[in-house]
Every structure is written in structure tokens, then in C-alpha cells.
Amino acid sequence: MYINIEKTTKLIQEKGCDAVILFNESNMHYICSFSPSEGVIIITKSGNSYHIVDSRYTETAQIHAQKTGLKVIEIKNSFLNEVNDIVNKENIKRLLFENETISLAQYNSYAKKLNNTEFVELNHDFMLMRNKKEAFEIELMKKANNIAEKSFLELLNEVKIGKTEKELAALFDYIMARNGSDGVSFDTILLTGTHTSMPHGVPSDKKIKDGDFVLFDFGATYQGYHSDMTRTIAIGNITDEMKEAYDLVLKAQLAGIKALKAGEKCADVYQAAYDVLNEKDMGKYFRHSLGHGVGLDIHEGYNASPKSNDKFEV
């Protein structure tokens, strides 16, 4: 049995249910190894697994099913009717569903049709399962990260005075694609000068000038898995104050890395970095969390913020 389906059947059994139904694109990818824009996956507690698709995805689903073992079903008239047939066939009485991502309208339509089935909230349990990556997932994430890093180093040759943020951001996306990225993890953030104070700023027609910081926030994807990197460089001659700020942020980053270990609270890792900044009264400018988990989603699982109750696990 495909490892991710095996893990899912254990979750179903632990929750005392008969099956789980998945609509979320990332959750479906976790099971079927690609990202259809629409579809339904049902997995039973015994491991019977179904992937319901429309004709746009039948061939792709069948190719991936050779690895996953999913039974591919092409809809005849509606997803709901196909789901109803499977629920009756498998005698599903308690069905886990994605209560945090499904729309109210979709829930109501399924609950009305499957009126003899109890819907049980999945909550965070599926994401908690996804948090722990299998070896093959780690390799895919490494590949995405390597593509992003290689592309960044290539882009540096093009970062020159007079180039605009938009121009370089577009070039960056092209270089990542050329190096094997399936797409960007998120809209590339490339900012210069005073714009670098905005953690999620949007590239503009602003040109790079001598003495600027240039901020890069970017990621590549590979077979559905994301990477996320942030880098800052200086152009030409910069002030002593800018050098001090750069060194302070680097020191804070290294303190966070040192504190990062299995069993450590995410909030404590954040605090380790914050304390370094606050030594120079710069903590008030730390407006963003220290970091977050990545995977099939760009923000997945852990969040290293002061309010997080999570602990890092191996």
C-alpha cells in the first residue's frame, strides 16, 4: 500500500470512522501525487481508495495510480452521485471531512445527499500527519530548494544599478523555470531601497541605486513541493548603519538556528532571535514571525511565532 494512504487509513481508524473524503488540492496531492484543480478522494479504513475525476484529469490520474494504487473513477454526471455510490458500496456510516476548508454550500449539498452518514470533523489531524515528511518528500523539497538557490546565484549576475524590481522579478521566475522549477511557490518578492522594509511588498518600477539593500523572497516548486528562501544583498557603497543592521539580523538568525532542535517550542526559537534584536532596541521592528513549515503548501504546519504552542519534531 502507498505509504501516504497507509498513514491515512491509520488516522481513520484512530478517529473511529469508516472513511475520509478529501477535496482540498494539497491534501489530494498528498494521496494521488498530483494537483487536480477539481476532484474527490475517498479512502476507507480498510485501505480501499478512490480518486474521482472529470475527463480533464482521467489520463493523468491513471498514470499516477500506477504508483498509488488508487481506483480512478471518471464522473458520469456529478461528483456527488459518484461519492454517494461509493458510500453505499462501502457502507460508510462515519465520514471524516475537511471542515476547515470545505465551503458551507458544498458541505450542505453532501450532507443532504448522504443523509444516512455522520460527518466527523477532521480539524488539524490531516495536516499534523502531513507535517512529518517521508524520505521521498524530503528529497523533493531538497530538489525545489536546490533549484531556487541555483537560480538566485545566477540572478545575482543580472542585479545591477538601474534595473527595476519588476524586471528582475520576472527574470528570476524565468531562471527558476529554466532550472527545472514547476512554478513559483508564491509571487516573487524583489524589493530595493526603502521598499525593503515591507516583508510582503510587491515589485514595482523602482530602480536599483548605489547604496541600496536589495531584498529577495522567493521559492521554486518541484512535483508539488515548495521551497521558500529570503536573501538580502547590498549594492555598491553602503553606510556603517546599514552594515550594523545587516550584521545584527545575521546574528539573530544564527541564534534562532542554534535554538532550533527537536522538542523545542516554536515560540522559544522565535524568542532567541528576538532577544538578539532587542539588545539593540530593534525588536519593535520584528513584525513578522521567524519562520514557518513548508511542504505541499507554502505555509504548512509549524509557525515560529511568539504565540505558537507548537513544538518542533523530527
Task: Locate the predicted segments by residue.
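Active-site neighborhoods and metal-handling regions in enzymes and metal-associated proteins
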Residues: 1-314
